[in-house]
């Protein structure tokens, strides 16, 4: 066996290991070259377990069911006598089977033994994000950091991951510090840039957030997997200040391009922005229809409820209410099925399905029903994944529904909560003025 760039043993030829190491660098920088380097590693040595595992993880991290099914073929029949490689194969198998929590625990176990396994750290971090588990999003990285040499060339990327975990746990100043330290290590660390951007959004520092993202645009606005999502953050900063023109310009330039309407996670960004504009009664023209069509072309399997909810946003926004109701019906059937997927079934039953029902009620103009469904679970939405900033689209929906339903006292509570967290929020102040 040879050693990877962190000093851990792995099976594979020298050429395969070299390509694998380069692939890991691209993975951490969210660069599309990760796919080519992974394929090169697989081609150099098809028996290289870590290369095959990385390829499977790339499919799983898309959050789309067909990619998860396809991921199985990369590890089918693979075994390893090496404990670390065997744990990776186990985690992949659990994830493909729908036990995302089981995969997370297996990766925790793996990192307890091998805290310098950079693939487990990176993949586990994304899995924590998909599961909405903020504590482990922070803890998984924090536990590993003492085992790393700060002079290691990959160390900065760990700080970027730590920054996002700290931010999701509400430690905004510490998150900004860690994120900026990560950027000092690697100017192209778009995950760290995005994490610092989150801290500005959560603190209500919208002008500062725009200035920061503009100052880092040479890194994030190029070809990388976070270009669309970081553009979305910039649009959200504009939206918080009710600068609808700027938000729509970003939507047209980046979020609604043919390229971005191919992957579920980027389509979710587009729909999330358009729905926020919809709540503010901004005319978005024909922008909903291409997005709704893109979602309609996706596999309908209930695999990740976060995506299902954003599909409903697009269908309701496009006036395709019947299709939105059909998605809710599929979700209801999935929850009742004895074969339901473990993790997604839990997320769907506890929060995802009620939110889906609330969104379709909103589409019907039944704002009382929207509030009655969503209000009891408004603090439980993290279970279906995403960040605080992403899930805020549902909190906004609740607030607008309450206002339209004439529930003045509840709206006052929701507005006060928002203004305490984001004192500079023009949007929250405007909602209060509507009363």
What residues fall within each predicted segment?
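TPR-adjacent "capping" and linker segments in tetratricopeptide-repeat scaffold/adaptor proteins
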Residues: 2-18, 75-85, 149-150, 154, ...
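Helix-coil-helix junctions within alpha-helical repeat/solenoid scaffolds
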Residues: 236-435
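Alpha-helical repeat scaffolds
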Residues: 36-40, 67-79, 101-111, 134-148, ...
């Amino acid at each position: 066996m040879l050693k990877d760039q962190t000093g851990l043993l792995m099976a594979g030829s020298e050429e395969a290991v070299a390509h694998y190491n380069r692939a890991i660098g691209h993975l951490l920088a969210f660069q599309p070259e990760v796919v080519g380097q992974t394929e090169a590693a697989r081609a150099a040595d098809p028996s290289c377990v870590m290369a095959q595992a990385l390829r499977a993880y790339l499919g799983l991290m898309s959050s789309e069911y067909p990619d998860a099914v396809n991921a199985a073929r990369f590890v089918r029949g693979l075994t390893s006598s090496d404990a670390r490689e065997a744990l990776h194969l186990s985690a992949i198998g659990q994830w493909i089977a729908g036990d995302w929590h089981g995969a997370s625990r297996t990766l925790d176990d793996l990192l307890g033994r091998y805290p310098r396994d950079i693939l487990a750290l990176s993949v586990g971090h994304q899995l924590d994000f998909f599961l909405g588990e903020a504590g482990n999003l922070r803890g998984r990285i924090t536990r590993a950091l003492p085992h790393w040499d700060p002079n290691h060339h990959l160390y900065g990327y760990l700080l970027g991951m730590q920054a996002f975990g700290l931010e999701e746990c509400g430690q905004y100043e510490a998150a900004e510090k860690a994120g900026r330290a990560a950027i000092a290590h690697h100017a192209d660390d778009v995950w760290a840039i995005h994490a610092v951007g989150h801290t500005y959004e959560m603190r209500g520092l919208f002008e500062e957030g725009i200035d920061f993202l503009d100052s880092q645009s040479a890194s994030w606005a190029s070809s990388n997997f976070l270009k669309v999502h970081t553009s979305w953050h910039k649009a959200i900063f504009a939206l918080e200040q009710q600068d609808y023109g700027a938000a729509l310009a970003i939507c047209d330039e980046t979020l609604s391009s043919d390229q971005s309407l191919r992957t579920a996670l980027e389509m979710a960004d587009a729909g999330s922005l358009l729905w926020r504009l919809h709540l503010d009664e901004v005319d978005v023209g024909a922008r909903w229809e291409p997005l709704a069509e893109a979602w309609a072309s996706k596999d309908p399997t209930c695999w990740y409820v976060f995506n299902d909810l954003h599909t409903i946003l697009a269908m309701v926004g496009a006036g395709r209410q019947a299709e939105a109701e059909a998605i809710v019906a599929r979700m209801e059937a999935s929850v009742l099925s004895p074969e339901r997927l473990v993790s997604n079934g839990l997320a769907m039953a506890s929060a995802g399905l009620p939110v889906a029902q609330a969104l379709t009620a909103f589409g019907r103009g039944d704002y009382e029903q929207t509030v009655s469904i969503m209000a009891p679970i408004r603090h439980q939405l993290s279970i279906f994944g995403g960040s605080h900033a992403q899930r805020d689209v549902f909190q906004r929906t609740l607030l607008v529904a309450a206002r339209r339903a004439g529930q003045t006292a509840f709206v006052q509570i929701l507005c006060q909560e928002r203004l305490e967290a984001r004192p500079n929020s023009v949007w929250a102040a405007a909602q209060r003025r509507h009363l």
